[in-house]
Every structure is written in structure tokens, then in C-alpha cells.
């Protein structure tokens, strides 16, 4: 009888662990993994023209294989073009602050 209880307990424990492992949702990538700087001093020319989508967005897609691009504005003309490898939304492109 004791052996049967031990087998059932072991089976139950293994079954629960398998369920937990397969039901854990995938962890989404952090911004640091998604956003990479385009490179060079291209921020202001890529982000300043008031066109839609920005040159940053278009060039990141064409030249870097990213899903899109975002502009991060600092003080004055301090701008960075970041290629976004996780999100392809052209509507969320311009971020203020954070440089």
C-alpha cells in the first residue's frame, strides 16, 4: 500500500511539473534587446524632416533588417535613431528624453 501511494505521489508531482513547464509564457524581449542604435552621426538628419514614416524608420528596415526605427530626442539637436527589431509600428516612432 505504501508503495502505491509513493508511485501516485511521484506521478502527480511529475505531471504538475510538466504542466508548469509547458504553460509558462514566453518572456518578451527587453528594450535593450529590441533597440539598437543605427550607427554613425545620423540622428538629426534621419529624424528632423517632418515626413511620415521617418527616414530613420525606413532606413532601419531597408539597411539593417529591423522591423522599424525610432527617434529619441534629447536636448537641442541631440537625436538618436534606434532600429527596432521587435516592433514594426510606424505610429510610435518619436520618443522624448532619455538620451
From Swiss-Prot:
Propeptide residues, chain positions: 94-99
Matches recorded under SMART domains: Knot1
GO-annotated molecular function: sodium channel inhibitor activity
Family from the record: Belongs to the DEFL family. Protease inhibitor I18 (RTI/MTI-2) subfamily.
Organism: Sinapis alba
One Gene Ontology cellular component annotation held by this UniProt entry: extracellular region
One Pfam family of this chain: Toxin_3
Keywords assigned by UniProt, alphabetized: Antimicrobial, Disulfide bond, Fungicide, Secreted, Signal
Cystine pairings recorded for this chain: 34-86, 47-71, 56-81, 60-83
Residues spanning the signal sequence: 1-30
Protein's job: Inhibits bovine beta-trypsin and alpha-chymotrypsin on a 1:1 molar basis.
Subcellular location: Secreted
Gene Ontology annotations of biological process type: defense response to fungus; killing of cells of another organism
This protein's record includes keyword Electron transport: no
Matching SUPFAM superfamilies: Scorpion toxin-like
Protein name, as recorded: Defensin-like protein 2
Reactive bond, annotated site positions: 50-51
Amino acid at each position: 500500500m505504501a508503495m502505491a501511494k509513493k508511485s501516485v505521489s511521484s506521478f502527480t508531482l511529475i505531471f504538475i511539473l510538466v504542466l508548469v513547464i509547458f504553460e509558462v509564457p514566453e518572456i518578451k524581449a527587453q528594450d535593450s534587446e529590441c533597440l539598437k542604435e543605427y550607427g554613425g552621426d545620423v540622428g538629426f538628419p534621419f529624424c528632423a524632416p517632418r515626413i511620415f514614416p521617418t527616414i530613420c524608420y525606413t532606413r532601419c528596415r531597408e539597411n539593417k533588417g529591423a522591423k522599424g526605427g525610432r527617434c529619441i530626442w534629447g536636448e537641442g539637436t541631440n537625436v538618436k535613431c534606434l532600429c527596432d527589431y521587435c516592433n514594426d509600428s510606424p505610429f510610435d516612432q518619436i520618443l522624448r528624453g532619455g538620451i
